[in-house]
């Protein structure tokens, strides 16, 4: 079965880079797929996206006119027609498996045919600065909840409930973990190395955050200080507030890191402070693009470099253009990417000999 996202890929490359290639830090490749049933309105919708680090590089949408796996970055456009034909065949096969799994899982959970249900899947691998394998992932979810996941040892499964144990027994009998491990430690790593080389100008860059602070009166006695970080890459960043040098984590409102729409990211952290005491508070920003951490303090003469109204309007527009399905898939990805167990439907690499990134085909649940 393949994993589904709350109501809302797979790639394999045959090229390999020499192990002498090194990068600044660790890197990851992730594929996320979501199938959503829609009773009375035709076949389930299937969306698959692939990420190298924080950059989406491929996408498939069964509702799109092209019905093809498509590049999402310029450096993927160098792949030839045979590559895209192979990836499209593989991702369509995965979509078909999910259609079957949706019916199977309804039976496992004794659900009626009338409601809409989802399957999500996330899989991928991480490499270290030397390009060598660090860890692999394979997770599945049903209706937004963990279903089954490949354990950190890549040899066994964790099932979330009695229904998932049925799938676990099937996959253990089929040797699914061994197939996944071979892909994750082999072709997944080779593909990631190749993408890092082909897209190095984008993937291996660091853009330092542009920072500023805004002040928003809450009442006659309190105000909100908001610390902004804009235009940074990669997405990993730390924003913290201190009062007189003491950490204010519990009193901090912190939003998830958000894509800016131009390949960079934005984030803010806010605290409510007594009016007139603003200068006791400092915001601390850490990011690999900075030579050293930044410390910001509100001054009465401070003016935001970007009007807050414009930023909020931009974020609203960004939310409007991103489809709900992909947003849900990404949210599920971030929630699960650092966990060794989640949900997932096993993929048997029927096409792995041909080097298809999507050849980690989902086994039926």
Swiss-Prot record:
Residues that carry a glycan: 110
Pfam families given in the database record: C1-set, MHC_I, MHC_I_C
PROSITE patterns: IG_LIKE, IG_MHC
Domain Ig-like C1-type: 209-297
SMART domains for this protein: IGc1 (SM00407)
PANTHER family for the chain: HLA CLASS I HISTOCOMPATIBILITY ANTIGEN, A ALPHA CHAIN (PTHR16675:SF229), MHC CLASS I-RELATED (PTHR16675)
UniProt keyword annotations, A-Z: Disulfide bond, Glycoprotein, Immunity, Membrane, MHC I, Phosphoprotein, Signal, Transmembrane, Transmembrane helix
Positions of transmembrane segments: 309-332
UniProt topological domain (Cytoplasmic) ranges: 333-365
Chain spans, region Alpha-2: 115-206
Location(s), subcellular: Membrane
Span list, region Connecting peptide: 299-308
Region (Alpha-3): 207-298
Protein name, per record: Popy Class I histocompatibility antigen, A-1 alpha chain
Family per similarity comment: Belongs to the MHC class I family.
């Amino acid at each position: 079965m393949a994993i589904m996202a709350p109501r809302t890929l797979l790639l394999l490359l045959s090229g390999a880079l020499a192990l002498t290639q090194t990068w600044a830090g660790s890197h990851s490749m992730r594929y996320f797929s979501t199938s959503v049933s829609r009773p009375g309105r035709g076949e389930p919708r299937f969306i698959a996206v692939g990420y190298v680090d924080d950059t989406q590089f491929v996408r498939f949408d069964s509702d799109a006119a092209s019905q093809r796996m498509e590049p999402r970055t310029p450096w993927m456009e160098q792949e030839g027609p045979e590559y895209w034909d192979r990836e499209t065949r593989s991702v369509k096969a995965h979509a078909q498996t999910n259609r079957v799994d949706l019916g199977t899982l309804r039976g496992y959970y004794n659900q009626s045919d009338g409601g809409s249900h989802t399957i999500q899947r996330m899989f991928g691998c991480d490499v270290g600065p030397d390009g060598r394998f660090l860890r692999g992932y394979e997770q599945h979810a049903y209706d937004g909840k963990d279903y089954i996941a490949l354990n950190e040892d890549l040899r066994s499964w964790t099932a979330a409930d009695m229904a998932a144990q049925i799938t676990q027994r099937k996959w253990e009998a089929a040797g699914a973990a061994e197939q996944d491990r071979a892909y994750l430690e082999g072709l997944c790593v080779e593909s990631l190395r190749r993408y890092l080389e082909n897209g190095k100008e984008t993937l291996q860059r660091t853009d330092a955050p542009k920072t500023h602070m805004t002040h928003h009166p809450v009442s006659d006695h309190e105000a909100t200080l908001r610390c902004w970080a804009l235009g940074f890459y990669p997405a990993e960043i730390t924003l913290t507030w201190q009062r007189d040098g003491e950490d204010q984590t519990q009193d901090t409102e912190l939003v998830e890191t958000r894509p800016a729409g131009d390949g960079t990211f934005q984030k803010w952290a806010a605290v409510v402070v007594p009016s007139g005491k603003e200068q006791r508070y400092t915001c601390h920003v850490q990011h690999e693009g900075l030579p050293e951490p930044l410390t910001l303090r509100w001054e009465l003469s401070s003016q935001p470099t970007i009007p807050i109204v414009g930023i909020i309007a931009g974020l609203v527009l960004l939310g409007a253009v991103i489809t709900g399905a992909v947003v849900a898939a990404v949210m599920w990805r971030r929630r699960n990417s650092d966990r060794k167990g989640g949900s997932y439907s096993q993929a048997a690499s029927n096409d792995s000999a041909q080097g298809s990134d999507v050849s980690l085909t989902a086994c039926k649940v």
